[in-house]
């Protein structure tokens, strides 16, 4: 790594090699050549003077790009597309006259952008499916383990560790559905010309409108898409970038919510993210086990969520058939949204596949609060024995306030059970109260809800996407 120039943290620290390649110059320029081949093939099939020999020559040099020639040419003409047209022509002298025939720069530029987003979304989808599988395994393993629930981060009715995980999982499932929808509806720009009218192609096809329409269909098919935009200016609608980045923003929201929950749970010492044997949590405090991966998820997630505003502003600021104030912004914002989301999902998979659960801490915290939550059950049991509901309610209120003071003022343990057992109005014993205080009696349908959700919603997704399961993620720091 160079140390005397700026290096993007996405390359050095966060994004995977796979995502970095998708947004590399090599992927871009090889896609340009694939698009030029698709254009030549379609024009040949529609009767233009493009020979099979020329197409074969283009295909022979689809991968071995002469970058040195393109770079030198760009110094002269200051135009990246025409520089690569020239370089391709140097390698393909027979095909040189028909390279880029009828097209504008946006033919390769915009279509490549859509193809790149598709490839990046497919990688995101793969990692999202693996994240779903990881959390599903955790939820199933701990679906029956009662834990204290929190609303407003204050003690609330118990749930289970696994049921809580299904909340993270539900978010990911919604993200998966959105990714699938976006992938299914992506369209290429096609071959639209300088203002979207296909005027140059109409001229090439001697006024044959059907051939112009067929050209778009053929290009879409050859590049693996269902369709091209039916209408456009010079570029595809920049709203598409917003749709894609919003989709990534949804994933960031889900991962950030998970990371926040986990950081709080780690503070409570109930669940921790993985911690390597030789990992150092703090340069000053050697005992520290900081949730650095979860914190990084939160940090990168904020970036992705805010970054989604860039394509929104860009789409809203385009004038008529096009302006170029989109280019510099989208070159950075869309790519980095994918690089960051890729890094987030790698961290998410890494963390969820190695979560450390502390059952005794979870049980102790639950039991410290459960007596308060069980007072309704205790009161009803006493009423069945002949007690006065109103009198018992007041006594429970008084005992609860006193027990709460012991915990919060004196720093003692919750003695509510002892207080109620000692009060003759309740006609009960400590043993009878403890029999009521079984955590599994207070979790409602949490275990069943978890099992149903996994069986009915998650498992069908994992079965459908079984070929995507199994991904090795590497966390650089």
Could you tell me what each predicted segment is?
Residues 1-199, 205-220, 281-282, 292-296, ...:
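A helix-coil-helix interface module used to build multimeric assemblies
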Residues 20-24, 69-71, 279-299, 321-336, ...:
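Short beta-alpha connecting loops at secondary-structure transitions
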Residues 78-81, 128-135, 139, 165-179, ...:
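Alpha-helical transition-metal enzyme core signature, strongest for iron centers
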Residues 140-162, 272-288, 321-328, 353-373:
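Glycine-rich cofactor-pocket loops
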Residues 163, 242-250, 377-385:
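Short, well-ordered beta-strand elements within core beta-sheets of diverse protein domains
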Residues 175, 179, 226, 233-327, ...:
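Glycine-rich anion/phosphate-binding loop at the beta-strand->alpha-helix junction
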Residues 272, 395-402:
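Active/binding-pocket-proximal capping segment
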Residues 303-389, 395-398:
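Long, amphipathic alpha-helical stalk/connector segments used for oligomerization, subunit docking
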């Amino acid at each position: 790594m160079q140390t005397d120039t700026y290096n993007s943290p996405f390359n050095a620290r966060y994004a995977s090699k796979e995502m970095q390649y998708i947004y590399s110059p090599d992927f871009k320029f090889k896609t340009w050549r694939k698009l030029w081949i698709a254009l030549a093939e379609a024009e040949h099939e529609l009767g233009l003077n493009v020979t099979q020999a020329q197409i074969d020559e283009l295909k022979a040099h689809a991968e071995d790009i002469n970058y040195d020639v393109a770079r030198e040419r760009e110094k002269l003409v200051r135009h990246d597309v025409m520089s690569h047209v020239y370089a391709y022509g140097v390698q393909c002298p027979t095909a040189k006259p028909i390279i880029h025939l009828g097209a504008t720069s946006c033919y390769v530029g915009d279509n490549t952008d859509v193809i790149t987003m598709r490839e990046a979304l497919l990688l995101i989808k793969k990692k999202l499916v693996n994240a779903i599988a990881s959390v599903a395994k955790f939820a199933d393993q701990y679906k029956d383990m009662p834990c204290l629930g929190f609303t407003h981060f204050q003690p609330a009715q118990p749930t289970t560790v696994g049921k809580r995980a299904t909340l993270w999982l539900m978010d990911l499932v919604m993200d998966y559905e959105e990714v699938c929808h976006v992938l299914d509806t992506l369209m290429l720009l096609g071959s639209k010309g300088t203002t979207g009218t296909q005027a140059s192609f109409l001229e090439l096809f001697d006024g044959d409108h059907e051939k112009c329409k067929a050209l778009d269909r053929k290009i879409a098919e050859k590049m693996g898409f269902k369709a091209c935009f039916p209408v456009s200016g010079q570029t595809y609608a920049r709203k598409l970038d917003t749709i894609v980045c919003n989709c990534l923003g949804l994933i960031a929201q889900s991962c950030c919510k998970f990371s926040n929950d986990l950081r709080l749970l780690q503070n409570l010492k109930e669940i921790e993210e993985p911690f390597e044997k030789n990992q150092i949590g703090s340069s000053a405090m050697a005992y520290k086990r900081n949730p650095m991966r979860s914190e990084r998820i939160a940090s990168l997630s904020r970036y992705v969520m805010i970054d989604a505003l860039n394509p929104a502003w860009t789409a809203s600021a385009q004038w008529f058939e096009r302006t170029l104030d989109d280019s510099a912004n989208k070159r950075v914002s869309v790519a980095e949204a994918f690089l960051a989301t890729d890094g987030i999902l790698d961290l998410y998979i890494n963390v969820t596949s190695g979560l450390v659960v502390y059952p005794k801490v979870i049980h102790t915290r639950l039991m410290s609060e459960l007596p308060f939550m069980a007072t309704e059950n205790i009161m009803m049991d006493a009423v069945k024995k002949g007690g006065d509901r109103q009198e018992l309610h007041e006594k429970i209120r008084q005992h609860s306030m006193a027990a709460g003071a012991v915990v919060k003022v004196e720093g003692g343990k919750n003695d509510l059970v002892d207080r109620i057992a000692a009060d003759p109005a309740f006609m009960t014993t400590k043993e009878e109260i403890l029999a009521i205080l079984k955590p599994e009696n207070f979790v409602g349908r949490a275990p069943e809800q978890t099992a149903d959700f996994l069986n009915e919603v998650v498992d069908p997704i994992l079965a459908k996407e079984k070929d995507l399961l199994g991904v090795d993620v590497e966390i650089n720091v």
